[in-house]
Amino acid sequence: IAGDDDQAIYQWAGADVNALLSRANREGSIKDVLKQSYRIPASVHPYAISLINRNKNREPKIWNPCKEKGLIKFPNYKDLSLFKEGQWLLLAPTGYHLDKMCSDMRNQGIYFKRKGFFSLSQESIDAMFAWEKLQQGEGLFLNEVKLIYKYISSKTGLKWGAKKLLGVTENETLTYEDLKGQHGLLISAETPWHAALDRMSEREQRMINSLLKKKENLKKPPRITVSTIHGAKGGEADKVMLLTDISRKGLEEYYKNSEEMRRVFYTAMTRAKQELHVVAPETEIEFGEIRYDHQKRQR
């Protein structure tokens, strides 16, 4: 059986720390503790170890970080400019604390994914690229034509009934000349995508333009993933931003069982491959052990 009692954060789903420890310490059991991490950088390692070693109900372990020195920082505010480059994981103990952050990120034109959904409609991105393919003389399949026609106004951009695309098969490709000559397209091939796809919302057009100016690669999934800590277990990223805000209910749970919350934040800290940014809370309610540890080290 493979398991890590320090990351058993799904107690409500049957991840029983006591059961795992009991099985590991049963007479005749052979324990093999992995002594080398190939993810956790040296700068994060002492903070993670210091946190989890406060738990009494655990299997003692000694393990080494990877060769990467890495970086750990303790900013006093959520600096969204950090997201300009690199692969990121934004983590918080609850979705509630991520909602406002996601709203701020959208307002600043930051491209991210959360729960499998992108902050910008994939349809909008695909339509923009499809129009550019037409401009470059490439052919589009039926599903691509339907997509751009969805964002083009009838009468001004398309002849009446053009969206029916009568007689077109799924495997057929259509060029700009085909669409203009046989399928009711009225727009010039020189028309910029944002003018051609005039039914796309202004917000999405602005965001796509902003991302293109920043040289964001929209042909790939977002570099930034937003998740609760529980949702990110098993994941990793080069850079992790960890929000330490907790709810009032979370604070009550911490007073009842601090070891459970330490496991949660230990799991979050150990997602980072290069950098960990532990952000100060916006309210007075926080899981403060990591930042308190940092303050002690600075004295």
Feature roles, as predicted:
Residues 1-68, 85, 89-107, 113-122, ...:
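Conserved helicase motor core of SF1/SF2 NTP-dependent helicases
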Residues 46-51, 125-133, 293-294:
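Short, surface-exposed amphipathic charged segments that create phosphate/polyanion-binding patches used
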Residues 49-53, 80-85, 163-174:
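Short secondary-structure transition/capping segments
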Residues 71-87:
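Conserved interdomain hinge at the start of the Helicase C-terminal
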Residues 111-153:
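Charge-dense polyanion-binding interfaces
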Residues 135-279:
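Conserved helicase C-terminal RecA-like lobe
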Residues 283-295:
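Charge-dense, low-complexity polyampholytic segments
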Residues 298-299:
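Acidic, low-complexity intrinsically disordered tails
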